[in-house]
From Swiss-Prot:
Function comment: Component of the Mediator complex, a coactivator involved in the regulated transcription of nearly all RNA polymerase II-dependent genes. Mediator functions as a bridge to convey information from gene-specific regulatory proteins to the basal RNA polymerase II transcription machinery. Mediator is recruited to promoters by direct interactions with regulatory proteins and serves as a scaffold for the assembly of a functional preinitiation complex with RNA polymerase II and the general transcription factors.
Organism: Caenorhabditis elegans
Protein name: Mediator of RNA polymerase II transcription subunit 14
Subcellular localization(s) per the UniProt record: Nucleus
Keywords: Activator, Nucleus, Transcription, Transcription regulation
Family the UniProt entry places it in: Belongs to the Mediator complex subunit 14 family.
GO terms for MF: transcription coregulator activity
Subunit comment: Component of the Mediator complex.
Residue ranges, compositional bias (Basic and acidic residues): 72-83
Primary localization: nucleus
Region annotated Disordered, chain positions: 22-98, 1434-1516
Length: 1516
């Protein structure tokens, strides 16, 4: 050990010498004040050591660039003089490594940072100064320049100071070396200390002197040999031999034999408490249940071998006291183990000694556990209820007292309370029976008291007390039962409950509910007697006092009887309180009464309740209670009236209180009063129910008194009495005389009225029933279905009707008597007025009207009559009384109309719910008929009018169903945008009972209902008639009954003639002077304002809507649509005239061509247009058109004529195809842009194009249902981006290129379709497909090559090729091409002066022009919009066009639901709102609200319109 340590100590002087040497070097370096050596520049430039706190270095620079090394190395040679050239001395300080010095940054990098910062500030300042131009900005600019100059100067001054500091910075290098040297020495000391600690704890721990082996040394010295080796060596390297399992089994078996033998010899001395002895594996386990368990064994075979105690287990447990741990600590158990082992070693009977020792310990432990449990209960849950009277661990006695009574005595000190336990329990160990364990003794003794189970191990004082409490409670209850039965022999006392016993007492003889039973129980914790009656409050004074009396030791029979009488009265009072809760009374306290009212209560018994009537607050019901031997509790009721400062009792009649004979009142819920001579059955009704009946009777009597007074004030005679025995309801207020309130003679009505009374029903709600009984009713139900209304066996022609009860309930809560009287009078007036008109009608009904109508119901306040051919129309008549005075002008009849199922379908098993919808057209004039009935009171005339006019009105009423007509195209043509471009197609309204007006645009038809089943129709359009051929329309239907009346009725003038609308168009407005002869006027299309007389059948046929080729229409509808279409077509053609088209200087070259209007009449329009034959704008050949109203079919047709020799393809078949296409597609479509596209198509004549167009139209019209390819011409284009409509077929201004759009699909109803778009070169006769699809281009090339070779026109060839490939699957609907029209909306025109465009305000005459791109310009035909079904309005229509937005009549309701004249939808919804030149034309609601645009010539320099002068449009 010394040899290893000495070298370490030997090196210490050298380290001390080195340390002293370094200290001298430090002192020499610090004393050296010579300047540093000159700085040698580094390759990367000058470097400077910067401190982080200098404020010049930037942290961002450190994070982005690596730190550089020192500018120059520390010169190790000291220079004594700058001019000396001698060899310098060596520096004693060590060199600082590169990474151990402070961080540095190159000076050039620092300068670059400063320059970049200044440049950035200058740039930002220059940008900000440009925005400051005012005077304030000039001042801010100057201040910004000053701040910038000051900041820049300060920054560069810091750099100058830094550069100057570099000259002397070399002196700081010495400090860096000193710092590094000190850190190095400190690390040496730390390493030395760590090494010494490691050696001390590791290597030197076993460096001690060994023990000297004397015996081997003697052997070696004496014998010269080494004979003995230490046993530690053997134990360390040679393990002991293990015993085998067989040997283990033999050993344990032998031990078991030895233990059995020894125990058998000791068996006579083994205590009997040891219940179990188990011998196994050489061990004997002895168990004393509930106390302990020990394990013993023998460690030898000799008789002298002592028993060895291996383990002791204490079985006494209490988890609450031990908090989950054993009660005996392991250290205590080890001590017990040692003491018991020593006692067993010296004992003659070790087994008995072990039992005696451990048994004594366990008994003491059990008693201590019980004491701890009792202490917890006394301090916790059973505080003040149990007490520990004695506890002696030596004597092993524990005495616990329970049911403690606390009392004060004069002998005690003030504040002290004496606690006396009524019962005690003693837990002890019997000295004479040491083996018996703990025993229990109760004071006083009783059977079946609680015991301790010592064998359980877990003793519980709580269980012992609980078992004891149950027995003690039963004892006390049995004693109380004997006391109660002795005090009240008739009182029935029952013992109930098993785990919680109690006594049940029936205080009243009729008590059957458990809530009214008194329950007497004993509190098991404190032993107090508890009394409870559920129906009474838990804090009831008498109940608590009775319980205290039973608990006290001084409880006499008289005291018990007194409390029982009080409780019976309290129970009856509570019964009464509960019985009147649902009645209109409330209980009041005596303190709430006035002083003079309290004086009246002086003689009344103290047990009483006071009930105040809610509806009659001046009346109080006083109910007093007093004990009685016979009735148990006697009640007395008095009525107290408090009026002003006076209070008095009112004597109640006997029939109100005791004379009510109740029978089956409870079971049936109604009161049936038996005759007065029969005996009363009050025993069937309990006492509180009789009180409720009495309160209700008194309340009824008071209410009737008030009502009778109010009725007598009105002059109505009344009588309050009961009805006969067979009439339920009790008291009733009978009305005997109403002559003073009836404004007319009503003797017949009162002869039919048997009884009129008012009853009060307060069972569930406080309601009044106005009851009237009639006989000889004028009208009864006589419909052919339903229940019969005459008795069997009576003749059908019997004049007297059955007696009928009519009872109507008025659910009026808290109503005042004045309101009830008013309602009674109103009800009588309603019956009287209804009876007046019904009685008069009943006389005519039996003679005449029963063949034309049926009575559905007559209930004296309402009459329901069904009429019509099918009896499916209902007339509902009622009378409403609104005024206070009977017979006032404010009263009126309610006349409503409805519908029902036809009578023939009531008994039918099959009902067609999909028939044409029915609505009652008389609802249009219900107000007019109501006013007439109010003036005349003549129901006979009203029913005559309804029966006579129902057939024609049902037909005419078809026009009142809501059907919208699109005005989007027309509004775009006129100019101003309309947000809701729809209008009602028709508007039907009634002027009076016999006059109707039907409006459709500018056309107004007046329909007169005449007698003799005749109808008169005339044209009453404003200013002049406009219906050409109106007589011819009805004459075509029935020429025999149709005639023109000679008397011409003047047309009413407009309310505002200046702005009401145009008169009628003249040829000068829309056409130039032409050298053409006008056609002769057809006399059948004459215009007249004379009424046209016809029969009902004629007007029904004219208005009968039917499904014709997919369109639901009728002759009159088709005629009016034609008249309206002619007016709209004239506007469309005027927009196609040269005057309304942009001039040639405009950049737009998409149009529908020019047309010239030749002649315009109400029944036709003639115009012409140049042919598109390849000559362009220089073409001289014309196409002549005539759109006219056919006098035979009374629908629109068109005639097309080409000049002779100009179109070889204009054959009769092709012309018929063109005209048929107009009739089936263009006209039903109703779209103005479709007409423009149609005209553009029919003008194309180059290279027999007419034949191709006719083929296309034929394919569309004659599409077979089985075909898999459906081809349709698209006439209208819907731009989804601009939401505008436009013609789908357009031509450029030079008339050289025309656009075609053809829709190809599998069927007309197919959801997927494709659009074939191509441009036809009119002059070159070839087609171009501007598409990115190579297949389409290839098809166009093939068609052009074929056309060039064989001649003909490529339009039909291309379409036919597409159809063939579509059928073969090469061209399918999924391959949708891109749209080729980017903007096809027409140019917008000037907004009218009074209507501004949406979201803009433009001056009158201003023009907003939209310039669509050229056809050949890139992007002008290819738009980004995707093609969908909304872009092509012609798709999936029966013949390619929509049905004018018309709806199925089955989907609409009654007229007027959208808005008639006067509604707020002026130019959107009102009929006639779209007229020439204005969205709100003639027929709109406010004619002066919408003006018309002024078409004035443009000023110089403007080129928006044609230079021709236009007159004001339209003319006023």
């Amino acid at each position: 050990m010394s040899s290893n340590v000495l070298p370490m100590y030997a090196s210490t002087p050298s380290r001390a010498f080195a340390h002293s040497k370094l200290s001298s070097q430090l002192r020499a370096a610090l004393a050296d004040n010579s300047p540093a050596a000159p700085i040698s520049p580094a390759p990367s430039g000058s470097a400077l050591s910067l401190d982080e706190s200098s404020g010049i270095s930037d942290r961002d620079v450190h994070s982005s660039q690596e730190q550089t090394a020192h500018l120059s190395e520390v010169d190790v040679k000291s220079i004594h003089s700058s001019d000396s050239e001698d060899e310098p001395a060596q520096n004693p300080l060590p060199e600082v490594p590169a990474n151990c010095g402070p961080p540095t940054i190159p000076l050039n990098v620092l300068l670059d940072f400063a320059i970049q910062h200044v440049y950035h500030e200058i740039t930002v300042l220059a940008e900000l100064m440009q925005r400051k131009t005012n005077d304030q900005g000039e001042q801010e600019r100057k201040m910004s320049l000053v701040h910038f100059a000051h900041a820049t100067r300060s920054q560069f001054l810091k750099l100058v100071a830094l550069v100057k500091w570099i000259r002397i910075s070399k002196r700081m290098d010495v400090c860096y070396s000193i710092d590094y040297l000190l850190d190095l020495q400190s690390q040496y000391f730390i390493d030395t200390a760590d090494r010494l600690v490691a050696m001390t704890r590791g290597d030197l721990e076993l460096a001690r002197l060994p023990e000297y082996h004397i015996a081997p040394a003697i052997d070696v010295l004496v014998l010269g040999t080494y004979n003995r080796m230490p046993s530690k060596i053997k134990e360390a390297f040679i393990p002991p031999a293990k015993i085998t399992p067989r040997e283990q089994k033999l050993v344990t078996s032998r031990l078991n034999q030895l233990i059995e033998s020894r125990l058998s010899r000791l068996s006579s001395g083994i205590p009997p408490n040891i219940k179990e002895i188990h011998i196994n594996n050489g061990l004997a386990t002895l168990l004393v249940p509930g106390e302990f368990e020990i394990k013993i064994t023998l460690l030898g075979e000799t008789e002298m071998t002592k028993w060895t105690l291996l383990n002791i287990k204490i079985l006494v447990e209490d988890y609450e006291l031990g908090m989950g741990l054993p009660l005996v600590h392991p250290l205590q158990l080890n001590q017990l183990h040692g003491v018991l082992q020593s006692r067993m070693n010296v004992s003659l009977n070790p087994i008995k000694e072990a039992f005696s020792f451990l048994h004594s310990f366990c008994v003491s432990l059990q008693l201590d556990v019980l004491f701890c449990q009792t202490s917890r209960l006394a301090a916790g849950r059973l505080r003040d209820n149990i007490t520990i009277e004695k506890y002696d661990p030596k004597e092993r006695v524990l005495v616990v007292g329970y049911w403690v009574k606390r009392s004060k005595s004069r002998r005690l000190t003030v504040g002290q309370v004496k606690c006396d336990a009524q019962y005690r329990v003693q837990i002890y160990e019997d000295p004479n029976d040491k083996l018996g364990g703990l025993k229990v003794r109760h004071f006083p003794h009783a059977p079946q008291l609680g015991r301790l189970d010592s064998g359980a191990g877990m003793l519980s004082i709580d269980r012992l007390l609980s078992e004891t409490y149950v027995v003690r409670c039963k004892e006390r209850l049995m004693r109380l039962r004997r006391i109660l039965e002795a005090a009240e022999p008739r009182l029935e006392v029952k013992m109930t409950g098993i785990s919680a016993p109690s006594l049940s007492l029936a205080l009243l003889p009729d008590t059957s509910s458990k809530d009214e039973m008194m329950t007497v129980s004993v509190n098991s914790f404190c032993g107090k007697v508890l009394c409870n009656v559920h129906i009474l409050s838990a804090e009831h004074e008498d109940v608590l006092a009775f319980g205290k009396a039973l608990y006290s030791s001084q409880c006499s029979a008289h005291t018990i009887q007194m409390y029982l009488r009080k409780l019976r009265v309290a129970l009856v009072i509570e019964r009464y309180r509960r019985s009147v809760k649902a009645l209109p009374v409330r209980e009041v306290q005596e303190a709430e009464l006035l002083p003079f009212a309290k004086e009246c209560l002086g003689d009344a018994p103290a047990q009483r309740i006071i009930l105040q009537f809610l509806r009659s607050e001046d009346y109080y019901l006083l109910v007093t209670f007093s004990p009685d031997e016979k009735a148990v509790v006697k009640t007395h009721i008095q009525l107290l009236e408090v009026v002003g400062d006076r209070a008095q009792f009112i004597q109640l009649e006997d029939d109100e209180m005791n004379g009510m004979h109740v029978k089956e009142a409870i079971n049936q819920g109604t009161m049936r009063f038996s005759p007065s001579h029969k005996t009363s059955l009050q025993e069937e009704c309990s006492r509180e129910q009789r009180l409720a009946f009495a309160v209700a009777t008194v309340e009824d009597r008071i209410t009737y008194m008030y009502l009778a007074a109010e009725l007598m004030k009105k002059g109505i005679g009344v009588d309050v009495r009961k009805d006969s025995a067979h009439v339920p309801g009790g008291l009733a207020l009978h009305i005997t005389d109403v002559k003073n309130v009836v404004p007319f003679e009503a003797s017949e009505f009162f002869e039919c009225c048997i009884r009129c009374c008012l009853r009060l029903d307060n069972r569930n709600r406080y309601t009044f029933q106005f009851e009237m009984c009639f006989e000889n009713i004028p009208l009864v139900r006589d419909v052919p279905h339903g229940l019969p209304h005459r008795r069997d066996g009576e003749p059908k022609d019997r004049t007297s009707k059955d007696a009928t009860w009519l009872q109507e309930l008025n659910h009026i809560n808290q109503s005042s008597p004045e309101k009830l009287v008013e309602l009674i009078i109103h009800r009588l007036m309603r019956y009287l007025y209804m009876y007046k008109v019904v009685h008069q009608f009943s006389l005519a009904y039996e003679k005449h009207f029963k063949n034309y109508c049926n009575i559905e119901a007559y209930t004296f306040h309402k009459l329901v009559v069904s009429y019509g051919d099918n009896r499916d129309m209902l007339m509902i008549l009622a009378f409403n009384v609104k005024s206070q005075a009977p017979g006032s002008s404010e009263d009126f009849f309610f006349l409503n109309f409805g519908q029902s199922m036809p009578h023939r379908q009531f008994n039918s098993t099959e009902i067609d719910w999909h028939q044409k919808p029915r609505w009652n057209p008389h609802s249009m004039m219900s107000q007019l008929m109501r006013d007439d009935l109010k003036e005349t009171n003549d129901l006979v005339f009203t029913m005559h009018f309804l029966c006579e006019t129902i057939r024609p009105l049902v037909a005419i009423g078809n026009f009142s169903r809501i059907r919208f007509q699109s005005q989007k195209s027309l509004s775009q043509l006129i100019g101003p945008d309309v947000h809701f471009p729809f209008r009602l197609k028709y508007h039907l309204y009634a002027l009076d009972q016999t006059t109707l007006r039907l409006m459709q645009g500018n056309v107004i038809l007046e329909i007169k209902l005449l007698e003799g089943c005749k109808i008169a129709v005339r044209d009453v359009s404003r200013y002049r008639p406009r219906c050409a051929g109106l007589f011819q329309l009805f004459s075509n239907i029935d020429s025999e009954t149709t005639a023109i009346m000679n008397d011409e009725i003047a047309i009413p003038q407009s309310d505002n003639p200046q702005t009401a609308g145009p008169t009628m168009w003249t040829p000068e407005q829309f056409m130039d002077s032409l050298d053409e002869r006008p056609e002769e006027i057809d006399p059948r299309m004459a215009i007249t304002s004379q009424p046209i007389l016809m029969s009902h059948d004629t007007i029904i046929k004219a208005c009968d809507f039917k499904d014709t080729e997919g369109r639901i229409t009728c002759p009159l509808d088709e005629y009016l649509c034609s008249i309206s279409y002619l007016q709209r077509a004239l506007l469309t053609l005027e927009r196609m005239s040269p005057r309304a088209t942009l001039n040639k200087n405009s950049s737009s070259n998409l149009s529908c061509g020019f047309v010239t209007i030749i002649d315009a009449k109400p029944d036709f329009i003639r115009f012409r247009a140049s042919q598109m034959n390849g000559d362009g704008v220089n073409a001289t050949s014309m196409v002549h058109y005539k759109i006219y109203l056919c006098p035979v079919a009374m629908t629109l047709k068109i005639r097309i004529e080409f000049e002779e020799g100009t179109n070889s393809a204009a054959t009769a078949d092709n012309l018929k195809t063109l005209t048929t296409y107009f009739e089936k597609v263009v006209f039903p479509c109703g779209d103005e842009y479709a007409l423009q596209s149609y005209i553009c198509l029919t003008r194309l004549t180059s290279f027999e194009a007419t034949q191709s167009i006719a083929n296309l139209m034929n394919v569309q019209m004659e599409h077979p249902p089985t075909s898999k390819c459906c081809v349709q011409l698209s006439l209208t284009y819907n731009n989804t981006s601009t939401k505008k409509l436009a013609p789908a077929t357009k031509v450029d201004q030079p008339l050289q290129n025309i656009i075609f759009n053809v829709i190809v699909s599998q069927s007309r109803t197919s959801e997927s379709f494709s659009v074939l778009r191509f441009i036809y070169r009119i002059k070159e006769n070839f087609v171009v497909v501007p598409s990115a699809n190579e297949k389409n281009k290839q098809m166009a090339d093939e068609v052009n090559a074929e056309t060039k070779t064989s001649g003909g026109n490529p339009i039909w060839n291309l379409v036919r090729l597409v159809m063939d490939r579509f059928n073969s699957g090469d061209w399918n609907p999924g391959n949708r091409d891109e749209p080729i029209i980017s903007s096809v909306a027409p140019p917008t025109y000037v907004n009218p002066g009074s209507v501004a465009g949406p979201s803009s305000v433009a001056a009158p005459g201003s023009v907003s022009i939209q310039q669509p791109g050229s056809v050949l310009q890139p992007g002008s035909m290819m738009g980004p919009q995707s093609v969908n079904a909304l872009q092509y309005g012609m798709h999936r229509q029966p013949m390619g066009g929509p049905q004018s937005m018309q709806m199925n009549p089955s989907s609409v309701g009654q007229p007027g639901s959208v808005g008639g004249p006067g509604s707020h939808q002026q130019h959107m919804m009102n009929p006639g709102s779209v007229g020439p030149g204005s969205v709100g034309g003639p027929g709109s609601v406010n004619p002066g609200s919408v003006g018309y645009p002024q078409w004035n010539p443009p000023s110089v320099g403007q080129s928006y319109h044609h230079p021709l002068h236009h007159q004001q449009y339209p003319p006023q």
